[in-house]
Amino acid sequence: MQRSIAMTAKRFLHRNLLENGKPRTASSPSFSHCSSCRCWVRASSSVSGGDLRERLSKTRLRDIKLNDAIDLFSDMVKSRPFPSIVDFNRLLSAIVKLKKYDVVISLGKKMEVLGIRNDLYTFNIVINCFCCCFQVSLALSILGKMLKLGYEPDRVTIGSLVNGFCRRNRVSDAVSLVDKMVEIGYKPDIVAYNAIIDSLCKTKRVNDAFDFFKEIERKGIRPNVVTYTALVNGLCNSSRWSDAARLLSDMIKKKITPNVITYSALLDAFVKNGKVLEAKELFEEMVRMSIDPDIVTYSSLINGLCLHDRIDEANQMFDLMVSKGCLADVVSYNTLINGFCKAKRVEDGMKLFREMSQRGLVSNTVTYNTLIQGFFQAGDVDKAQEFFSQMDFFGISPDIWTYNILLGGLCDNGELEKALVIFEDMQKREMDLDIVTYTTVIRGMCKTGKVEEAWSLFCSLSLKGLKPDIVTYTTMMSGLCTKGLLHEVEALYTKMKQEGLMKNDCTLSDGDITLSAELIKKMLSCGYAPSLLKDIKSGVCKKALSLL
């Protein structure tokens, strides 16, 4: 059996190394090239065995810092005789938990140079570290060395390699490795299969994941909660809500209890698809099954309720979350603050803002952006500007969205001149302005009758390396209509079609539809009913006409 496994694994190893270019040795970075490692030379080399045993205890290793771990290794390799390989493995495992994979690889090489004989556990640690560093070829080299020494790979070995392949999106190689192991009578555990299914789902190959799922069931391998959760996530991300719900039911029928991750994934999917009622029912089902919702579950549901203007229910859910001992984080606060601001209840949003500070949570750029926009929407320009000024005082860096909100708010509230001062300052500071920034200013100019200035700015976009989107075009066309510049409107319309921006009803977003409706209204009010308007009505904006 061992010889059969070794021969098959060697063939697989040889094929994979050749496919990926020149075979590489398993040599790993020397200590001089490992930034995390320090000098090995110490003033004293006398180390007592009792001291080492105490430092290698589970209690000490549990919270060990990297520098202390390297010091301990240095003392271990100076000790005579060397500590057992079990002790070295325990230390290496502790460093793995720190995610310092390159350090583990270097220490493993040092052990080899010193003649400290590895066991299967050591090889598995090093293979896993190479895989975590996205160096699957080097992991395969270690596998080859391990086989030459007569060690038989176990489930951990195969699981690590499968994970390594999947991390590199080499799912077919992962499947091939598992198939080869099965051929020779080796039975990988569900962990290896789960890694493959999860990888297929994350690369949008959900149908392949389902086929693989059915195949392992036929082989008599029982899926677990991780298997189902990966599939539920994959289906949700592919907008296959019904299939995900059926899979959840199938899971329960097979007496595999879903966990909070499974439920949260499906609940979030329902929310994003506008199925808030189903999301609430799923939440209630979780509670009935004694599965405690976590911060992700609550935040998803709060977000869904806010998106559908059920702000009071969202607030109640927030209070329930806190009462259950689930501490609200900045994301959950931002979600509810945004809901209040959208509902024109910015003062309620401010209460939450102050509550965050009282609870020791630090507001971020998103928090400030949300409240600044909320004040502008409420018509409180002074408060919005004051809040913007506070950002610098509290060390919160504004991003491009902050400035876009500021420009839009000023323009919408009749403060174009102030907006232009800020816009000019942004240009002087060579900020990375996006199409939203320019569209906002163009809209503000058109709104105040400065169509020529808007047209000049629009025409300069290509020189700035920016491409107008449908919002930019529609905004500019609307402004031109007010000045009776039909020739320019028709030219822009033709350009939009050439750019492929004239979408059909199926692909228009809600914002695009609203803009199209506004444009049609503007053209009708200006007395235009040429073939252009007829074309727009019949082709692009059937949905928009319902808004007229």
UniProtKB/Swiss-Prot annotation:
Q: Which cysteines are cross-linked by disulfides? A: none
Which keywords accompany this UniProt record? Mitochondrion, Repeat, Transit peptide
InterPro entries documented for this protein: Pentatricopeptide_rpt (IPR002885), TPR-like_helical_dom_sf (IPR011990)
Task: Tell me where it resides.
Answer: Mitochondrion
Swiss-Prot/TrEMBL PPR repeat ranges: 84-118, 119-153, 154-188, 189-223, 224-258, 259-293, 294-328, 329-363, 364-398, 399-433, 434-468, 469-503
Q: Where is the transit peptide?
A: 1-43
SUPFAM superfamilies in the record: TPR-like
Q: Name one GO cellular component term.
A: mitochondrion
One Pfam family name from the record? PPR_2
The record's annotation in PROSITE patterns points to:
PPR (PS51375)
Query: What protein family is recorded?
Result: Belongs to the PPR family. P subfamily.
Name under which the protein is recorded: Pentatricopeptide repeat-containing protein At1g62680, mitochondrial
